[in-house]
């Protein structure tokens, strides 16, 4: 394709709010254009890359007998009310109302709709298992869209849904999909690591995320260097081994702590290590207030709280609620209280006595507080985030951290949706049973961004061969010169029969063409320049920067060999 005919609006400067390198490069190279916050158009080069990504996805889905369908993005509220997610999903669900007053949502996911499609059709165990997938735009009303395609309000996803008669069948499809995802990310050029994860608003009993390693990733991966252990930090279990630091029990004292609001400020004020301070936070669990205690250097993990209490209906109490409940602001909370409120403490609080806690009075704290004498803990548990260097639950070593971009996730849903939506089948005994489900997502547009995030240098994008918008970049330095133009035209006609060629025939300065070529990042470049009359051209590899002069008689062989050896 001739570059003069392709819409590639490259930029010299990008908006300052473009934080991620992938966002900057996708804008700068003319692949995407922002419409409004979190919403982008995919221009010709990006569309070609997306087509290559989705072709790989379709191949791998067909390989495991997943059948493609296409469902509407617009979903009626009644389906979401059946599953209970209309109210539970929260403000990220894009809701709208038609002229007749009916409520709809622009789907962020399609569990309800696909369940409604199959519930009257998959009637017998003989029809199972069945796996359906689609590739479609999804919508999420992000509070703060950022990082370009990584966290947008409209995005492209591949979502698949499987239906089973028993858990063994679900296990097999889950493993098939897990392996397919591993192949997909390897084929598109992403270093992605599967990690144990939380199922979030989708629900289910078991899930893995596929994380593309990246410094700008919004998720923290906990992993072992001694085993294949990897988990999202939200799910990484903290191993508790008692290490009591009990000293002689002291008398409780109330001390004045003016303008002290954080654990670190309190530790500095008292001249004590922050891990000897105990923080108190108040949560509402299904409408009931509870206190949760952790040591000063630890952070409460609300995902673990949701898992522990078996509900998603958990939220941190507001400042007004806290003041009304205990008469003090959040920085002064403590477990010594004369109100009926259950107290839960992280396991590691057990290692201390003579605790330092808030006095439930602004400007004051209590020292030498002891469990059993001054207050009681209802239950201990793992309620916090793991720290780097702590022991891992698989006994393989210690926790190491890396940042990652979630590009895919696989879920075992069980009967969460089929039971609430009455999707049943007859088993081999003729008894009605709820369909057992799995769901599996890949962020297609996120994958595009993650590829760029992992495959670039200071000059621009470096496309992997499998997804590159074009295979070769043919550049005529000066098309006004007959020998250069004629040779470039001839090479374009020859190579375009075997490769996808982007032919830069523009009347632009050589520097502009080279800068754009580096920015766009096609794997191989053929430059027709001043030695055109001799039949000599330059061949350059984008990844390594290696270049050589080649006679046109040898050019097809050289290019074919280099292309075959590309990653």
From Swiss-Prot:
Family: Belongs to the class-II aminoacyl-tRNA synthetase family. ProS type 1 subfamily.
Protein name in the entry: Proline--tRNA ligase
Ion transport keyword on record: no
GO molecular function: aminoacyl-tRNA deacylase activity; ATP binding; catalytic activity, acting on a protein; proline-tRNA ligase activity; transferase activity
This enzyme's EC code(s): 6.1.1.15
Gene source species: Staphylococcus aureus (strain bovine RF122 / ET3-1)
UniProt xrefs under HAMAP family: Pro_tRNA_synth_type1
Any one GO BP annotation for this protein: prolyl-tRNA aminoacylation
The protein's assembly and partners: Homodimer.
Subcellular location: Cytoplasm
Gene3D superfamilies according to UniProt: Anticodon-binding domain (3.40.50.800), Bira Bifunctional Protein, Domain 2 (3.30.930.10)
Catalysis: reaction(s): tRNA(Pro) + L-proline + ATP = L-prolyl-tRNA(Pro) + AMP + diphosphate
Domains (record comment): Consists of three domains: the N-terminal catalytic domain, the editing domain and the C-terminal anticodon-binding domain.
Keyword presence, ATP-binding: yes
Keyword terms of this UniProt record: Aminoacyl-tRNA synthetase, ATP-binding, Cytoplasm, Ligase, Nucleotide-binding, Protein biosynthesis
Gene: proS
Function noted in UniProt: Catalyzes the attachment of proline to tRNA(Pro) in a two-step reaction: proline is first activated by ATP to form Pro-AMP and then transferred to the acceptor end of tRNA(Pro). As ProRS can inadvertently accommodate and process non-cognate amino acids such as alanine and cysteine, to avoid such errors it has two additional distinct editing activities against alanine. One activity is designated as 'pretransfer' editing and involves the tRNA(Pro)-independent hydrolysis of activated Ala-AMP.
InterPro entries linked to this entry: aa-tRNA-synt_IIb, aa-tRNA-synth_II, aa-tRNA-synth_II/BPL/LPL, Anticodon-bd, Anticodon-bd_dom_sf, Cro/C1-type_HTH, Pro-tRNA-ligase_IIa, Pro-tRNA-synth_IIa_bac-type
A GO cellular component entry from the record: cytosol
